[in-house]
Amino acid sequence: MTNAIDKKVNLLDLNREGIKEFFREMGEKPFRAEQVMKWLYHFCVDDFDEMTNLNKALREKLKQVAEIRAPEVREQQQSSDGTIKFAMTLFDGQDVETVWIPEGDRATLCVSSQVGCALECTFCSTGAQGFNRNLSVAEIIGQVWRVNQLLGAYGKTGIKPVTNVVMMGMGEPLLNLNNVVPAMELMLDDLGFGLSKRRVTLSTSGVVPALEKLRERIDVMLAISLHAPDDELRNEIVPINKKYNIEEFLASSRRYVEQSKAQRKVTVEYVMLDHVNDSTDQAHALAKTLKDTPSKINLIPFNPFPGSDYGRSSNSRIDRFAKVLMEYGLTVMVRKTRGDDIDAACGQLVGDVIDRTKRILKRQQKQRGGEAIAVKTT
């Protein structure tokens, strides 16, 4: 087994096939992998000694070559509406934020995929802070794992805290495709968290080549961050549009949905920026832009953050905008803002995370004698 003794393998980094291969290399039967996955994801167990249907020799062997390691909760804040924001410390000491949003019999977890974000959308706090690095598979799925464990996981209280996952936290998921896809596979896998395809949503700002690859690899719900009715405005507020314009983005989204068994319409996210993208003329333009794309539109009231140049559209402007879209037969929803009193709402995820990350990076650089730290973006 390659480097198994020199470096323990984090089992949360492996999807079903990866864990089976790991056990094969150990000389164990594949069913042992399935037993361990159930302990990992159905009971959120992180101690091999608690896996009582494994013999003692195997448990001892696993202790030597494997570990179960998820991000740790450094801090949590609870909103007046019940939303909880978790500051999660990653394996190198940096932080990301994860948000748990309860509503009736469902609870949605907003999961981060990167430390910071490279796309620099002008209305997003995370994008304003810059990009540091991608999260590993274990750091992504580990957010779900840790919240399930913390809030009362399977078999412990009878509660299943996370019923839905949205890849809408810090970062652009499609710029970390090779780690995001295995993590989502574990969300869907019956031996993982067992969520249905309709309960896992990936949101993207339009990395078109990666969206084409996503279509070939996994079927989950797709949400697209559009935020403008035309290329001129989108170039300004979502800079990646200069590389992949609206027409390319929508065409790729249509191809994804046409192949999908999870959804028939693209979910279009549109943040409402006061007197920037919220006029009735822009509503008409948006409807015409979407005329060939089966879609439902999610209007998102802007959530201000320190240093932002934008204001939130008034309720009356949002209502007028929605009515125009509905005149074209479009399905329109206005997202209810959750967790804004703890900076956990859409576009606000950063808190003191980036400042803490920068301090850690400076310390690491100093330890390395000022050597630049390489960052992968794809």
From Swiss-Prot:
Q: How is the cofactor bound?
A: Binds 1 [4Fe-4S] cluster. The cluster is coordinated with 3 cysteines and an exchangeable S-adenosyl-L-methionine.
Q: Where in the cell is it found?
A: Cytoplasm
Gene name linked to the record: rlmN
Protein's UniProt name: Dual-specificity RNA methyltransferase RlmN
Which cofactors does the annotated protein need, by name? [4Fe-4S] cluster
GO cellular component labels: cytoplasm
Q: Which domain of life is it from?
A: Bacteria
UniProt keyword terms in alphabetical order: 4Fe-4S, Cytoplasm, Disulfide bond, Iron, Iron-sulfur, Metal-binding, Methyltransferase, rRNA processing, S-adenosyl-L-methionine, Transferase, tRNA processing
The main place the protein resides is cytoplasm
Q: Which cysteines are joined by disulfide bonds?
A: 110-346
The miscellaneous remark of the record is: Reaction proceeds by a ping-pong mechanism involving intermediate methylation of a conserved cysteine residue.
Q: Which residues form the active site?
A: 97, 346
